[in-house]
Amino acid sequence: MKITTSKQMAFALLLFASTVFMACNGSSDTNSNNDSTAVTHSDSVQHNAIATHAHATISGTYTDTTVNGSASFDQTDGKVKMVLDLTIPAKANKSVAVHLHEHGDCGDMGKGAHGHWNPTNKQHGKWGSSSFHSGDIGNVELDGQGKGSLTLETDLWSIGGDSTTNILNRAVIVHGGVDDYVSQPSGDAGNRIGCGVIQ
């Protein structure tokens, strides 16, 4: 009877030790899975923090020229859609050039924005041609009341992406003349009569 009890006790201890070992091993796997889930959740939160909408309110840079307008930017499926609306009564029945410039600074009659935004170091040209700046939007035709609009959709821009595509904190510049799409470095588009910062 003593031998049977000892064998039973030894078997029970062996069974207990195996159970503890398996439980510890399983616990380690569970913690590993939790860590992986936590990282995935963190990545997801960072991804959701990227903006999908931006806006610029465009105002005149000269006291003798009324310029009102807005540019709305929405990002969906890797593309940014811009809807630009302008009202410039002094330019009724004419066209004006619009470009994105490097810096979001409308000071000094728009000169604070510096040159055209050109992260790919290409020659100035017409949007969609073999060579053009990422900021070369083009000409906007105005009606008899000086109102005009333009819609553009592209995968060359992003809202909050890397420096080669990010349009945030750039300036939307309205020029007094038209872009000839040939003259370097900016299409001979004339003075900067309107400006707005993309935010």
List where the protein language model places each region.
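Extracellular low-complexity Ser/Thr/Asn/Gly-rich intrinsically disordered segments
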Residues: 1-3, 24-26
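Bacterial N-terminal signal peptides that target proteins for export
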Residues: 2-12
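C-terminal motif of bacterial Sec signal peptides marking the signal peptidase cleavage site
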Residues: 19-23
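N-terminal leader/targeting pre-sequences
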Residues: 25-95, 100-199
